[in-house]
């Protein structure tokens, strides 16, 4: 497990998303430990072991931020009993009233339990040292978190120019708009929803833009 600034990077197993634990314990905030995405919930023992390696327990997680509503990112939400749930307002309906067409849980042979959503994020909201950026395209309510150097981008962009698929609740035009927004950021570290996290984030954003036919 690698730590970048105050973010611990936890690699997802098999179909699980990556998870990112933001250590906000020195900020004096109500949210000391923030977990970004929880995977499918099918590898909970591994995720717990990684969290305990940091020196905290699952019960210590105060807030879960889901980058979007797909099962491989929200399926483990139930394992953190004291955590509030935050997601973009456009994807909140999928957690409050789960629909397999929105969560794509049927692709994993599972279901998503109904969740309370405590925080509905919008563009420009703040959490810890990060700003919320709306990045639809993979879903209508995709979001990214940016702190001036680190971009936690869910399934919007992957290393080496990949982008999230747009045929399961997404939209290519939304994806292009999101990439147009992200290409203007100064990104030293790109932390995607799957696959490796990488340095020189702008180079990977550039490759994604080129793949989508966007001039960089």
Give each language-model segment a name.
Residues 1-53, 144-159:
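Conserved beta-strand hairpin/beta-sheet module of binuclear metal-dependent hydrolase folds
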